Amino acid sequence: MTDRKLTFLRRFASTVVLWSIALWTILSGNEPGFMLLISGLGLVGLLEYYLMLDAKKLPNFKMFGLFCGALMLGGSFYMLGWRGLKPDAIYDFEIGALLLFLLVVFARQMFLTVQELVPLETMAFTLFGLFYVPWPFSFVAKIVYLTPRTAEGFVTGHWYVLFLVLVTKFSDMGAYLTGTLIGKHPLVPHISPKKTWEGFFGALAFSVGGGCGLVALMPQKLSFLNQTHAVILGLVLGFAAIVGDLAESLLKRSCGAKDSGKFLPGIGGALDLIDSILFTAPMIDRKSTRLNSSHTVISYAVFCLKK
């Protein structure tokens, strides 16, 4: 068996297993399982980020960063799911947590001698990891718990997480297929030589088409969205997914890494899997709750159009 076929089979097997677990967790409404899935992927992605820095010999407080990441992801689920805090309260919690992390990082230096002081880059690399992975990934929890529940108290936000993930992956699929078939004009060759403008527009077309298709197929499950929202969200999420993919490519190129890790055979690391979602999840923002409770999961772009 050739290396190319073996890579394809590994990628296919990893994709089937991963999507089976993810879809079952999302569609079943299993809240503890969903929390473990999101927190686990976020922490593994953060670990891969720090390991890439280690491979490049870039200093960082890896253990402190992982502890803060776990607190941020776990805290979001606890505050939203178990405490049932309102949007303003959870955002206050996150801001307070980030400020506390910053305070601890600087306070740590006060107990060291001049010879032991770590450079500013160490603190910057550590804190950047928190802003890059666990903080944006925690928006997935917000989508679940800030969406109105059913009269019986069951969450409905998992359907919008499914919408988010599928539209994001439609964007990735559109970029790959269009770029492979007709791609000729490089998008940003110094970052990712295989990315093309044709793939860029293909990604937007697929994400819009996928969003409209999902709203048409599941009108009752996605009752807070209509076709106009689907088009706008498709464009916003498609563009954000492209930027997220390029951002990770820039990070890997800076660290001299081909993949973020080997967590998923044939695919790469967890960070390779969630790179686009890190940028698309915050696009479905709670600011639209200022309209009324039935618009919780409509993106800020839709909110602005209604102003």
Residue positions per predicted region:
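Membrane-embedded alpha-helical bundles of polytopic integral membrane proteins
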Residues: 1-235
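Alpha-helical transmembrane segments that form the membrane-embedded catalytic/substrate-binding core
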Residues: 14, 175-176, 195-207, 241-244, ...
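Hydrophobic alpha-helical transmembrane segments of integral membrane proteins
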Residues: 131-132, 261, 278-279
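Short helix-coil transition sites and intra-membrane helix breaks within transmembrane domains
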Residues: 167-170, 240-244
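Re-entrant/interfacial helical elements at transmembrane boundaries that shape
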Residues: 179-181, 252-255, 278, 282-283
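Interfacial helix-loop-helix junctions of multi-pass membrane proteins
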Residues: 247-263
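Juxtamembrane boundary at the C-terminal end of a transmembrane helix
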Residues: 286-290
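Single conserved hydrophobic/aromatic residue that forms the stacking wall/gate
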Residues: 291-307
